[in-house]
C-alpha cells in the first residue's frame, strides 16, 4: 500500500482501489505523478487491477463533476445512472430505483454475487473489453473489463465475501481476475 508514485512505478503488480469522486481524483491522480506511475506500470505489462473508481479512471472521460478526463488507457466513457429508472421494467409510472446503486447483484455469465456501490458506470468503446456484465434497472453495464495486463471491476471484491476473495486470489495468483 502506497501513495508514493515512485514506489507505485516500481511495483510488479498494482491494485488501484477507488473511492470518492472522479473530479477531485483527476487533479490528484490523473494529472499528477501517480497517473504517470500507473501508466508506466500498465505500459510495462505488469498486472493492474482497478477497483470501482479505479476502473473508471482507466477510461477516457467521465461525466461526473461536470466532466473530466481519465487516464485514457482504454477507450470509452463513464456515465451516471439515470435517476428516473423504473424499479420494474415496463412500468415508467411506478417506483424508481435509487442512485447510487448500492447492494448485492449477480454478474453474467458467472452468476456469482458481488457488492456494488456506485452512481456511475463504464461504457467502453470496445465491447470486447467486457468479461462480466451486471444489470441495474434498464442499464446493463460492465462488471469487469480486461485487456492484456489490465483488469478492472466495478464491484468491491473486498466487500463481496467469498466471491470477492476468489476474485482477488485469482488476480494475485494469475495476474487476472
Regions picked out by a protein language model, each given a short descriptive name:
Residues 1-50, 56-72:
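Flexible gly/pro-rich beta->alpha loop and the following alpha-helix that scaffold active-site loops
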Residues 1-3, 33-37, 102-104, 117-118, ...:
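A generic local structural motif
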Residues 15, 49, 115, 131, ...:
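Hydrophobic/aromatic beta-strand patches that form the interior of the parallel beta-sheet core
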Residues 22, 35, 100-104, 164, ...:
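A general structural signal for well-ordered alpha-helical segments in protein cores
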Residues 52, 118, 156:
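Histidine-centered divalent metal-coordination motifs
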Residues 60-138:
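Pocket-forming structural segment of enzyme catalytic cores
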Residues 122-177:
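C-terminal and late-domain segments of enzyme folds
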Amino acid at each position: 500500500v502506497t501513495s508514493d508514485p515512485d514506489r507505485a512505478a516500481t511495483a510488479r503488480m498494482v491494485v488501484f482501489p477507488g473511492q470518492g469522486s472522479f473530479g477531485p481524483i483527476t487533479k490528484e491522480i490523473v494529472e499528477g505523478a501517480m497517473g504517470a506511475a500507473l501508466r508506466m506500470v500498465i505500459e510495462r505489462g505488469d498486472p493492474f487491477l482497478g477497483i470501482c473508481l479505479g476502473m473508471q479512471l482507466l477510461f477516457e472521460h467521465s461525466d461526473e463533476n461536470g466532466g473530466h478526463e481519465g487516464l485514457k488507457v482504454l477507450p470509452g466513457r463513464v456515465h451516471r445512472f439515470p435517476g428516473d429508472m423504473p424499479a420494474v421494467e415496463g412500468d415508467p409510472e411506478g417506483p424508481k430505483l435509487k442512485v447510487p446503486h448500492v447492494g448485492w447483484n449477480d454478474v453474467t455469465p458467472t452468476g456469482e454475487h458481488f457488492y456494488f456501490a456506485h452512481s456511475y458506470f463504464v461504457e467502453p468503446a470496445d465491447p470486447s473489453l467486457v468479461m462480466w456484465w451486471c444489470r441495474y434497472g434498464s442499464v446493463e453495464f460492465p462488471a469487469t473489463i480486461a485487456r492484456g495486463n489490465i483488469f478492472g471491476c466495478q464491484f468491491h471484491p473486498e466487500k463481496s465475501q467469498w466471491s470477492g476473495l476468489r476474485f482477488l486470489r485469482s488476480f494475485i495468483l494469475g495476474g487476472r481476475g
